[in-house]
């Protein structure tokens, strides 16, 4: 399970990740044609900023979050608006994802909150199960690169990311980026639902 008191965080307003603006790396990915409007799942949608931004651009979006209060706040933002956007409370590791499959899954800093390798691998399996064949997952992940810091996103290495994701999905791109709202290094990880299983490593004889 992730941090046990997400609902308390939303109740207190202690939300350094919630800037009220769409994630710049997502905006760049969409506006440069990385993905066109499609059925989309956002995991860890929080108060809905990114999901709503996508819906405003023609995406059909389901945003899920483990915090009922976050979901309540997200729903309030779209009340009375003519958007293909909805929100649901979901423990992503433990429950089936409703309304799938999807062509695109997005998470900003949700995958990286899980400390155990088995949890991160389970997260990737859940994403793969929610995608159509060839569907894309964009995950923005705190990085072990950069200067030491005492606050900010959890840090994960490229190796930890690959070990969790590669059995379930094909990594298309893993590059250094930045969480601009935190001035912290990040990984931009784009993966694709496999159409054939990954093959085992081979020896050079």
List each model region and its residues.
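Class I (Rossmann-like) S-adenosyl-L-methionine-dependent methyltransferase catalytic domain
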Residues: 1-41, 47-99, 114-130, 135-205
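Short catalytic micro-motifs in class I SAM-dependent methyltransferases
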Residues: 109-113
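A conserved beta-strand element that flanks and buttresses the S-adenosyl-L-methionine
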Residues: 106
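Conserved acidic residues
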Residues: 103
């Amino acid at each position: 399970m992730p941090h046990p008191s997400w609902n308390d965080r939303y109740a207190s307003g202690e939300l350094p990740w919630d800037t009220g603006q769409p994630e710049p790396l997502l905006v760049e990915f969409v506006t440069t044609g990385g993905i066109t409007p499609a059925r989309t799942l956002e995991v860890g949608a929080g108060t809905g900023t990114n999901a709503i931004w996508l819906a405003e651009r023609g995406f059909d979006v389901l945003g899920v979050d483990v915090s009922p209060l976050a979901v309540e706040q997200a729903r309030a933002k779209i009340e009375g608006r003519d958007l293909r956007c909805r929100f649901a409370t979901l423990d992503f590791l433990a429950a089936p994802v409703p309304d799938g499959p999807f062509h695109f899954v997005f998470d900003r800093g949700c995958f990286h909150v899980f400390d155990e390798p088995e949890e991160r691998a389970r997260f990737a399996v859940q994403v793969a199960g929610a995608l159509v064949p060839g569907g894309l997952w964009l995950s923005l992940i705190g990085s072990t690169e950069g200067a030491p810091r005492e606050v900010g996103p959890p840090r994960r290495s490229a190796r930890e990311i690959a070990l969790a994701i590669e059995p379930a999905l094909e990594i298309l791109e893993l590059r250094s980026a930045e969480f601009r709202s935190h001035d912290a290094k990040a990984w931009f990880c784009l993966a694709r639902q496999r159409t054939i299983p990954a093959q085992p490593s081979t020896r050079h004889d």
